[in-house]
């Protein structure tokens, strides 16, 4: 006796995957890779060379990785006094000696309020990984420094003598972090003098 074939499955009731559901499964790639670094100078070892406390932490290239790392670790509020967080393009070390930084300089803003540093740091990170700067190829990275007297945020660039590029970056950064004034110093000047004079101001 022949068995009856099972009835066909009605697929009209199965909801299709939405674009949003599909997107969740696919990480959102950034335009380039970035690396977080950590530096703690609060307990320097005797005779240690400058920069020896600088440690590479994580390299990432997706939006999801960025937010996970930021939320769990890389907030200035988690830093002790005399410690720094860095976010630099992958392949560039946050040192004057790095070939990409050797002829550069930095825009700097100071803050006496921890909350301000936290906000400016996050706004800067999002602008960097989101490629919001017109002269983004001239940017190396950003450093958040927690100090006893006041905190500091520094945006490092490659070609200090390219005034047009630096002023464009400076104006955009000032707008992003919503501050009154920022100044730019050359790394070469900083090597010679502890408090290097400002070359550009916006």
Curated annotation (Swiss-Prot):
By its UniProt entry, which SUPFAM superfamilies does this protein fall under? eIF4e-like
GO annotation (BP), single? regulation of translation
Name the positions where mRNA binds: 46-51, 78, 96-97, 147-152, 191-194
Pfam families linked:
IF4E (PF01652)
Query: What happens on changing residue 115 to P?
Result: In haplotype K1, allele pvr6(8)
Question: Any idea where this protein resides?
Answer: Cytoplasm; Nucleus
Q: How is it modified after translation?
A: According to the redox status, the Cys-101-Cys-140 disulfide bridge may have a role in regulating protein function by affecting its ability to bind capped mRNA.
Taken from the UniProt record, the cysteine pairs bridged by disulfide bonds within this chain are 101-140
Task: State any further remark.
Answer: Displayed sequence is from cv. Florida VR2, cv. Yolo Y and cv. Yolo Wonder, cv. CDP06433, cv. CDP09688 and cv. Zunla-1, with allele pvr6(+) (haplotype C1), and correlates with susceptibility to pepper veinal mottle virus (PVMV). Plants harboring specific haplotypes couples for eIF4E/eIF(iso)4E are resistant or tolerant to potyvirus such as potato virus Y (PVY).
- Known partners and oligomeric status: EIF4F is a multi-subunit complex, the composition of which varies with external and internal environmental conditions. It is composed of at least EIF4A, EIF4E and EIF4G. EIF4E is also known to interact with other partners. In higher plants two isoforms of EIF4F have been identified, named isoform EIF4F and isoform EIF(iso)4F. Isoform EIF4F has subunits p220 and p26, whereas isoform EIF(iso)4F has subunits p82 and p28.
User: What is this protein's record name?
Assistant: Eukaryotic translation initiation factor isoform 4E
Q: Which organism is it from?
A: Capsicum annuum (Capsicum pepper)
């Amino acid at each position: 006796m022949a068995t009856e074939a099972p009835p066909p499955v009605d697929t009209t009731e199965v909801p299709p995957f939405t674009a949003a559901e599909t997107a969740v499964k696919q990480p959102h790639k950034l335009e380039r890779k970035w690396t977080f670094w950590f530096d703690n100078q609060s307990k320097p070892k005797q005779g240690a060379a400058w920069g020896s406390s600088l440690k590479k932490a994580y390299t990432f290239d997706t939006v999801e990785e960025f937010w996970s790392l930021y939320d769990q670790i890389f907030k200035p509020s988690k830093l002790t006094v005399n410690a720094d967080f860095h976010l630099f393009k992958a392949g560039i070390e946050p040192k004057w000696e790095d070939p990409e930084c050797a002829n550069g300089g930095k825009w700097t803003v100071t803050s006496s309020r921890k909350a301000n540093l936290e906000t400016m740091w996050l706004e800067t990170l999002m602008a960097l990984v989101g490629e919001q700067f017109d002269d983004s190829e001239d940017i190396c990275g950003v450093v958040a420094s927690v100090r006893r007297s006041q905190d500091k945020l520094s945006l490092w660039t490659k070609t200090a003598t390219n005034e047009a590029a630096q002023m464009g970056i400076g104006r955009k950064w000032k707008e992003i972090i919503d501050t009154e004034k920022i100044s730019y110093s050359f790394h070469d000047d900083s090597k010679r003098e502890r408090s290097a004079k400002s070359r550009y101001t916006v």
